[in-house]
Amino acid sequence: MKIQADDGDIYICKYLTQLQREEIDCLFYELVSHDLLSWLGIRSPEIALMEVDPLHLDSKKIFFNKRLLRQKTWVLAVKWLQDTELLTSLTGISKRSLLKKFIDPYLLIKIALFDLWVDNVDRGVNREGLANYNLLIHARLIDKQVKFTWVPIDHAFCFGGVTKLRILNPSFLPEVAHKLPESPYFQKYYKLLNKEDLHQIIDNFLPLSSLSGIEEIVNQAYAQIPVEWEVPKHLPQRLINFLIDEARVQRARYLIKDRLR
């Protein structure tokens, strides 16, 4: 659902639409993932928790989920980012001259590592071989030159998505199958990178000494969510245990290095 908020900006709003109540956890996943990306210095669209009042909705435009017209509903609102294009299977990157136009050419490596770390099952290649990148290419004017950056979006299916709802634990080690490194775009992209710098980026990603900050990030995200969502109180600790597991972090690094040989 797209709405214009009181601040005049456009937001894409996400809310529970299925009968399976546990899927509300995915909105919590999205909030946690956004904060983790910010902590890692990876920009994603701004998000906010927003209470939508039926009085502000046009009933003629609400074709599904009529309950939105009957009661106030808490939603996760993602701010619409201007000057962006959605990366698709038709998008290619095959020349270093194009890669140099990106503000941080190694950012996609960091996003791939992030996806393995948090088990993002919604960015990569599906079992039918179709790519779903959930990445925007954002154009920015810097010193009178147009520069680009990748912006990751849609993180509701991190932490294993709906198939691992409320059973997530550190024994679920990262796997590269169907993830971003297997996508055609990534396969062309990484071959353009300096291998020495590439390995340095991987080795420095998420230093184990920094994992102590994870607990505060997850707990602060949980403190923000509405009580109406009824997200279990034990879920934050489950996510924390999953994220701070050193074996999982090390395996994420290994998988990326192995894929880039």
Task: State each model region's role.
Residues 1-261:
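Phosphate/dinucleotide-binding and metal-coordinating scaffold of catalytic cores
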